[in-house]
């Protein structure tokens, strides 16, 4: 096998969920049928790696010092939604009418993996809360053990700065049937039920 082909296969393996076989299929596809697409992919990847950084305010990906959301004068600066990843921010932007600002952790607390408050930029978040503009912090971390631990830490941080913490509701999926919902989800939904208005 060609050394360059081996390097291409190994390069594809850096992507999440891509093992040896998938990487091999991708490499063969690019070389057999999509050489022009491969050139565009290489150019876009090279350009993005060089030019895309993090917003100094929210830590989202951007080509500028401050992203378009943080720079927008039409956003509600009293609400700050804290998410684990840029993909989570994008999901909230597309699915809701949320008009506040964001803070992207780029992960979640995981002491076993060496990810603590410093790695998540929580010192920067603390400074932002201390500035006094934010009145509500919406905690939108995932419903995993690490996500819940992160949410607890964030709620404490918000309270230290007299900011009201709120957490996204969790439980029954829209259109879901009780008999098909897993026990943990059903138990959580039942325990956090709310009054019908």
Swiss-Prot record:
InterPro entries per UniProt: DNA_Rcmb_RecR, Rcmb_RecR, Rcmb_RecR_Znf, TOPRIM_dom, TOPRIM_RecR
Residues spanning the signal sequence: none
Domain Toprim: 78-173
Pfam families: RecR_C, RecR_HhH, RecR_ZnF, Toprim_4
Keyword set includes Transferase: no
Domain of life according to the entry: Bacteria
GO terms, biological process: DNA recombination; DNA repair
Entry keywords, A to Z: DNA damage, DNA recombination, DNA repair, Metal-binding, Zinc, Zinc-finger
Zinc finger (C4-type) boundaries: 55-70
Record function comment: May play a role in DNA repair. It seems to be involved in an RecBC-independent recombinational process of DNA repair. It may act with RecF and RecO.
Similarity comment text for this entry: Belongs to the RecR family.
Name of the protein in question: Recombination protein RecR
GN (gene name): recR
